[in-house]
């Protein structure tokens, strides 16, 4: 026996067999040990050969284990193994078989054949008992080999390569394991048309990710199984090549090429009977490429050109351009079939076709209105992905969320269970007490506990019953689906008696039972478990994904929106027109009446400094998101140079920072529903306005990497001081309309008409009047009071002190900012000195009154300390 004549896998098996024999304390190395390791192999080549030869691998394993149990064991020997005569004969027979077949190496299948042939070995009897004869094994080996010989030490990898490195889609379709393919008839017909050509009969499906390229290949497999294809494609097999399995574990140079050649040889040997489907086809280019080695695409080219290899590829537009088009010799061998994104109507049809599979998986029902909502909402709000993939994901996640709720304990029952635990803890504590009040309390508590437990038991029983009903309906759906699959198989195989039983007996019976179960469905009034996915569930998932509030508004939210002006006016004083315009835009959006192709609202706020332009934007962010920082704030003074426009949308290719994206586009892409503030817009370079044109008109902007960013759910606010000099010259009683034309003239001279024409509203903020300063004092003092609250210090200002601050801080040219400085200087600075000096301990009350030209501070400390009085410096 020359070990070099044996393949690497056989050598590995022989090594394992010897180790096993020593572990079992056997002194002799027998054929039974070899058969044992062959049958225990994870890849199961020997077991597969036995099954294909009409035998039972499990039976062979049991018979061989029985033979092994009879072998003598010797404990405490020298640890050596001697070769038995039957095993030596097996090796000799295997070498003879390999020589006759023209093989250079003895492979696993020849070793198994020798174990079946050699009558002196008990393995022959074990295999015969299992139903695998030497003749049957020989026939199976010849079928697998297809005339090929074992010329390398890794020859087994080349046999039955399609089974190892490809999935049979037609077999999966036959067994009903593929999802139904709805629509896409034109693309499938075009694919069949290309496949039916004489040469270059290789279509490549090109389309955006998620439009259904792989589904078209599965649709083709379903059509082949149903016989709904031209004569030239009937009874063909569609095999999906697994590039990962081909590359995985290929350690040595040439091993990958050997595997791929084995796949190609098997496909060619079928004489056009196999169509190869290569998903992510761009992975072929460069796959397996190493120093001097050929990549996969170069190995495929000759077979593709001669028409010996039928192939269907699938890849995205970008990957096709980047990888396949760079190799014209490969590209010309494929015929592109463009797969467009389906429209909303087609997507709804696709969802209706898939609905049953998802209902069966999640064990919930999906309403038709939920499917319509999934298609329409995903199309409108999830702009960076494609239909139907994003709509299917929405439906899937909404059903998954509902199933999770069904499996979780209902809130009502959860509260009762928590109450029971609380009462039990209290009961144990009261048992230790002996006084009368504790005894009375314990009696009451026992009654309450018994009552609560009774309620909880009743609710638990009801919840379990409702869950059981859902489970019953789900089981019926599963049985109905299995019956329909069986009917399709029976019709294909000509088993008309069974088909008749299914069509007129079993299926109608199951349908009737399911209809009755759904009629008693537990999602009626007063039900604890919701089992139907509704549009609200879909809308909730969209809101969680995007942050855009599209789910149904609660009553409180509606009221809040209707009194939005009052809420905003709490922090922005005297600018009723601006507050009203912004509120109306938000209400339009939440009511679903805004133009779906434009931002929610776009405004220019004009007015002198310090009148509340930026403050209104912050208040709006606080109102919508409960966080005034939830906005993109861009100070246009930073965008005064021409090149700074690139910072908004991202640097172009070839420039530093290309991968990082733009300040504006990235912020909106991450959070599509927010306020975008362009502060001091007049300071920006004119090119910035060119970028904003498409944002204001179409609600979209293309960033430096070519991605389209959706601005349809943003509120765009631009602030400017243009024309403010006219407004500061107004009298207290003058109307803002008197200077509107002068201000607009200045605005029109600075901004181009095409920019101004796209703005929803240009709002003038008038200068603050003296009588409005009191309200601003209130707002500023509230902020100061909230800062002092941490120290439990209470601040009170009487009317005179407030009036003193309002008068001292009034400056029509500078708005509310001088008032902020006066409060800082006259109140905050003095308080800071007194706190640090120990005059105001924590928990004190500070009363502020006004003197003739200063504020007086009266401190009432916590109990037990004397009052102090001090005055602010003039």
Curated annotation (Swiss-Prot):
InterPro entries: AAA+_ATPase, ATPase_AAA_core, Chaperonin_ClpB, Clp_ATPase_C, Clp_N_dom_sf, Clp_R_dom, ClpA/B, ClpA/B_CS1. It comes from Agrobacterium fabrum (strain C58 / ATCC 33970) (Agrobacterium tumefaciens (strain C58)). It is found in: Cytoplasm. Belongs to the ClpA/ClpB family. ATP 2 binds at residues 607-614. Residues 768-874 are annotated as: C-terminal. One of its GO terms (cellular component) is cytoplasm. This is Chaperone protein ClpB. Keywords: ATP-binding, Chaperone, Coiled coil, Cytoplasm, Nucleotide-binding, Repeat, Stress response. The Clp repeat (R) domain probably functions as a substrate-discriminating domain, recruiting aggregated proteins to the ClpB hexamer and/or stabilizing bound proteins. The NBD2 domain is responsible for oligomerization, whereas the NBD1 domain stabilizes the hexamer probably in an ATP-dependent manner. The movement of the coiled-coil domain is essential for ClpB ability to rescue proteins from an aggregated state, probably by pulling apart large aggregated proteins, which are bound between the coiled-coils motifs of adjacent ClpB subunits in the functional hexamer. The gene is clpB. Part of a stress-induced multi-chaperone system, it is involved in the recovery of the cell from heat-induced damage, in cooperation with DnaK, DnaJ and GrpE. Acts before DnaK, in the processing of protein aggregates. Protein binding stimulates the ATPase activity; ATP hydrolysis unfolds the denatured protein aggregates, which probably helps expose new hydrophobic binding sites on the surface of ClpB-bound aggregates, contributing to the solubilization and refolding of denatured protein aggregates by DnaK.
């Amino acid at each position: 026996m020359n070990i070099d004549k044996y393949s690497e896998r056989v050598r590995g098996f022989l090594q394992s067999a010897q180790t096993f024999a020593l572990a079992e304390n056997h002194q002799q190395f027998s054929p039974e040990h070899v058969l044992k390791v062959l049958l225990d192999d994870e890849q199961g080549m020997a077991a597969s050969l036995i099954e294909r030869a009409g035998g039972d691998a499990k039976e062979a394993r049991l018979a061989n284990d029985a033979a092994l149990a009879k072998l003598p064991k010797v404990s405490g020997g020298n640890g050596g193994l001697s070769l038995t005569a039957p095993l030596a004969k097996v090796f000799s027979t295997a070498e003879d078989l390999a020589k006759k077949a023209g093989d250079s190496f003895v492979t696993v299948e020849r070793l198994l054949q020798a174990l079946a042939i050699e009558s002196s070995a008990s393995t022959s009897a074990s295999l015969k008992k299992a139903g695998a004869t030497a003749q049957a094994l020989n026939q199976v080996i010849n079928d697998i080999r297809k005339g090929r010989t074992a010329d390398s030490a890794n020859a087994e990898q080349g046999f039955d390569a399609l089974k190892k490195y490809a999935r049979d889609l037609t077999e999966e379709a036959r067994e009903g394991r593929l999802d139904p393919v709805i629509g896409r008839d034109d693309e499938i017909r075009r694919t069949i048309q290309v496949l039916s050509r004489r040469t270059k009969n290789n279509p490549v499906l090109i389309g955006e990710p998620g439009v259904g390229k792989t589904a078209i290949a599965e649709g083709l497999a379903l059509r082949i199984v149903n016989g709904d294809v031209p004569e030239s494609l009937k009874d063909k097999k569609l095999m999906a090549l697994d590039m990962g399995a081909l590359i995985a574990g290929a350690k040595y140079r040439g091993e990958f090429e050997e595997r791929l050649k084995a796949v190609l040889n098997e496909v060619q040997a079928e004489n056009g009977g196999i169509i190869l489907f290569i998903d992510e086809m761009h992975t072929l280019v460069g796959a397996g490429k190493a120093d001097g080695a050929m990549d996969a695409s170069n190995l495929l080219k000759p077979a593709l050109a001669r028409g010996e290899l039928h192939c269907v590829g699938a890849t995205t537009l970008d990957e096709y351009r980047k990888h396949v088009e760079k190799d014209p010799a490969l590209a010309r061998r494929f015929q592109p079939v463009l797969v467009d994104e389906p429209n909303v109507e087609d997507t709804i049809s696709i969802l209706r076709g898939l609905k049953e599979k998802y209902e069966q998986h999640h064990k919930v029902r999906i309403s038709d209105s939920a499917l319509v909502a999934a298609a329409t909402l995903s199309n409108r709000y999830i702009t960076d992905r494609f239909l139907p993939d994003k709509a299917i994901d929405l439906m899937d996640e909404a059903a998954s969320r509902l199933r999770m709720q069904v499996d979780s304990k209902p809130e009502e029952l959860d509260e009762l269970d928590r109450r029971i635990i609380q009462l039990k803890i209290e009961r144990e504590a009261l048992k230790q007490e002996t006084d009368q009040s504790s005894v009375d309390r314990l009696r009451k508590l026992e009654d309450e506990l018994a009552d609560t437990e009774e309620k909880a038991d009743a609710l638990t029983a009801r919840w379990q019953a409702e869950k059981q009903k859902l489970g019953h309906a789900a089981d019926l759906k599963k049985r109905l689906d299995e019956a329909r699959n069986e009917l399709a198989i029976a019709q294909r195989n000509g088993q008309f008696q069974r088909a008749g039983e299914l069509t007129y007996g079993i299926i109608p019976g199951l349908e009737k039972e399911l209809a009755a179960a759904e009629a008693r469905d537990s999602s009626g009034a007063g039900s604890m478990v919701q089992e139907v996915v509704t549009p609200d569930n879909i809308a909730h998932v969209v809101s969680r994904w995007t942050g855009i509030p599209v789910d149904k508004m609660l009553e409180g939210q509606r009221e809040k929106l209707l009194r939005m002006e009052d809420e905003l006016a709490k922090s922005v004083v005297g600018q009723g027109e601006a507050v009203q315009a912004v509120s109306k835009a938000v209400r339009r959006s939440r009511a679903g009446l805004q133009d779906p192709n434009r931002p929610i609202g776009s405004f220019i706020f004009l007015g002198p400094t310090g009148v509340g332009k930026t403050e209104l934007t912050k208040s709006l962010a606080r109102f919508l998101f409960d966080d005034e920082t939830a906005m993109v704030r861009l100070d246009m003074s930073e965008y005064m140079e021409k090149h700074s426009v690139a910072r908004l949308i991202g640097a172009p290719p070839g420039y530093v920072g290309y991968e990082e994206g733009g300040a504006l586009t990235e912020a909106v892409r991450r959070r599509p529903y927010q306020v975008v503030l362009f502060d001091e817009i007049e300071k920006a370079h004119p090119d910035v306005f060119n970028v904003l044109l498409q944002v204001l008109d179409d609600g979209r902007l293309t960033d430096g990497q070519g991605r389209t960013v959706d601005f349809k759910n943003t509120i765009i606010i631009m602030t400017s001081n243009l024309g403010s000099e006219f407004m500061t010259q107004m009298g207290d009683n003058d109307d803002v309309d008197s200077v509107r034309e002068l201000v607009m003239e200045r605005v029109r001279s600075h901004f181009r008409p095409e920019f101004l024409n796209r703005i929803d509203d240009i709002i003038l903020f008038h200068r603050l009047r003296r009588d409005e300063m009191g309200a601003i004092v209130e707002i500023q003092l509230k902020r100061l009071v909230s800062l002092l609250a941490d120290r439990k210090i209470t601040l009170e200002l009487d009317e005179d002190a407030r009036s003193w601050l309002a008068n001292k801080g009034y400056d029509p040219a500078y708005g509310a900012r001088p008032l902020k400085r006066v409060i800082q200087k006259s109140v905050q600075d003095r308080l800071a000195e007194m706190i640090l000096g120990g005059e105001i301990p924590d928990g004190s009350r500070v009363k502020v009154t006004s003197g003739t030209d200063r504020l007086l501070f009266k401190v009432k400390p916590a109990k037990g300390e004397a009052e102090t009085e001090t005055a602010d410096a003039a």
